[in-house]
């Protein structure tokens, strides 16, 4: 019915926002790691 449709929509939105924030965290880690690797390559410390 109407209730399950609303519940499904809310769950979907929660899931999407959860995935987005997880993606952002992972993305930041990847960027940081990339910067670290680039930095040590430039300095020749890898």
From Swiss-Prot:
Compartment annotation: Secreted
Xref: InterPro entries: Antimicrobial_frog_2
Entry comment describing in which tissues the protein is expressed: Expressed by the skin glands.
GO cellular component assignments: extracellular region
Record carries keyword Cytoplasm: no
Cysteine-cysteine disulfides: 40-46
Domain of life: Eukaryota
Stretches of the chain forming a coiled coil according to its record: none
Chief site of localization: secreted
Pfam families linked: Antimicrobial_2
GO biological process, one term: killing of cells of another organism
Alphabetic keyword roster: Amphibian defense peptide, Antibiotic, Antimicrobial, Cytolysis, Disulfide bond, Hemolysis, Secreted
Role description: Shows antibacterial activity against representative Gram-negative and Gram-positive bacterial species, and hemolytic activity.
Family affiliation: Belongs to the frog skin active peptide (FSAP) family. Esculentin subfamily.
Protein name: Esculentin-1R
Organism lineage: Eukaryota, Metazoa, Chordata, Craniata, Vertebrata
